[in-house]
């Protein structure tokens, strides 16, 4: 069991980088207290050994039954044998005791290190959203608060019949031109940020979009980035919050940024869905040029039925008490149809109103699919500036049960981080 500790440390470290996700549940349980040898049993065993020694000596002794040799054989030899066995057992007990204590110390250090790694976070330098309701977070938040539905009957590019959803209509009529236009707009925002950053800072790109437009979006976006910023952005293999989670581990050793871009433009949307395009630029160090940025903490993945533990773990990563949370934001059909999220909030002791401050963005803005977590994060980050820590629960895909929970706070510096961007 304890070999796991060393295997984990061996495989998790690659050129100084931790490459495995934080998973506290994989840490072995605390070693049980080693039971002390039962004194009464050993005394009874001593009596048995001595009686057996006397009986065997009397039965097999043919010489005169007197003298030192006789009595040592009858009494001393059994007693010495018992003492040797008891000494070995006592030594084994002490060895087990020391081993258990050392394993528990090692386990505690591992947990402490994993928690410290889990509490890595990123600062949101800038965010942007394209939605039919509007492009400003204030407008979107007001729409969510007023529950003003943005859905309307539209004809998606991949459907014969019309569907009631929150569509970006321009993308349905002239998709290629709109992709070029919005890409230029987003890259221009990235350029404004990179101009204020050191030239040698590592830059990563998380680009998530629908499969039918992926090749066009990736090629054009990467070319635009290189042409306008003059920087080489490393495209991450992962998508969504899973990519952000991995980025915190794989690119933590030195200051860097992550450009997270999501195009959610489904060709065949369901009723109540939404088109949305989001952009966030995240830094794994506090940025001097942006002193008032909020902090996105490591997300935790779970399922709707087990969100109590997921929320508890997300609070641990944020090093935040549940009573400090001021509001909640959630999106996704599994969360909307179930009671797991409300129960998780109650059981973790949140104090904000679950009817007023626990906001679902889907009734007003529609369900944005792969962009839904980032849309909720953008709204929560804007609210955090004015209202304090926010918690987000988001389901990235209606076809999967995974739900991500994360916390946004105003954070100055983390223990593991060093230096600024």
Which residues are covered by each model-predicted region?
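Surface-exposed short loop/turn segments
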Residues: 264-266
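Conserved "HGTGT" condensation-loop signature of ketosynthase/thiolase-family condensing enzymes
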Residues: 2-252, 269, 278-421
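A short, hydrophobic beta-strand-centered structural micro-motif
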Residues: 254-262
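Aromatic/basic-lined ligand-recognition segments
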Residues: 272
């Amino acid at each position: 069991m304890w070999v796991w500790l060393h295997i984990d440390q061996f495989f998790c470290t690659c050129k100084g980088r931790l490459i495995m996700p934080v998973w506290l549940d994989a840490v072995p349980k605390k070693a049980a207290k080693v039971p002390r040898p039962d004194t009464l049993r050993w005394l009874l065993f001593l009596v048995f050994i001595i009686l057996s020694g006397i009986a065997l000596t009397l039965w097999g002794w043919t010489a005169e039954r007197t003298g030192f040799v006789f009595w040592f054989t009858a009494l001393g030899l059994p007693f010495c044998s018992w003492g040797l066995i008891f000494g070995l057992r006592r030594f084994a007990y002490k060895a087990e005791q020391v081993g258990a204590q050392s394993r528990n110390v090692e386990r505690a250090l591992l947990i402490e290190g994993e928690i410290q790694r889990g509490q890595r976070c990123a600062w949101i330098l800038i965010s942007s959203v394209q939605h039919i309701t509007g492009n400003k977070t204030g407008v979107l938040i007001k729409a969510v608060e007023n529950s003003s539905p943005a859905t309307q009957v539209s004809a998606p590019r991949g459907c014969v019949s019309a569907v009631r959803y929150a569509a970006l209509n321009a993308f349905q009529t002239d998709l290629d031109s709109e992709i070029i236009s919005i890409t230029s707009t987003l890259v221009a925002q990235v350029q404004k940020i990179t101009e204020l950053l050191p030239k040698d800072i590592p830059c990563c790109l998380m680009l998530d979009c629908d499969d039918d437009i992926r090749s066009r979006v990736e090629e054009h976006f990467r070319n635009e980035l290189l042409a306008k910023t003059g920087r080489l952005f490393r495209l991450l293999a992962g998508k969504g919050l899973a990519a952000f989670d991995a980025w915190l581990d794989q690119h933590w050793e030195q200051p860097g940024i992550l450009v997270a871009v999501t195009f959610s433009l489904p060709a065949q949307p369901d009723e109540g869905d939404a088109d949305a395009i989001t952009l966030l630029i995240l830094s794994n160090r506090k940025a001097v040029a942006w002193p008032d940025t909020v902090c996105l903490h490591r997300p935790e993945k779970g399922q709707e039925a087990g969100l109590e533990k997921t929320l508890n773990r997300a609070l641990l990563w944020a090093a935040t008490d549940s009573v400090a949370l001021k509001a909640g934001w959630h999106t996704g059909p599994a969360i909307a149809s179930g009671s797991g999220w409300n129960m998780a909030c109650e059981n973790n002791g949140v104090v904000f109103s679950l009817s007023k401050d626990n906001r679902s963005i889907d009734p007003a803005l529609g369900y944005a699919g792969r962009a839904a977590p980032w849309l909720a994060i953008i709204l929560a980050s804007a609210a955090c500036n004015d209202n304090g820590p926010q918690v987000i629960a988001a389901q990235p895909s209606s076809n999967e049960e995974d739900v991500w929970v994360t916390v946004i706070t105003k954070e100055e510096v983390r223990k593991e981080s060093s230096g600024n961007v």
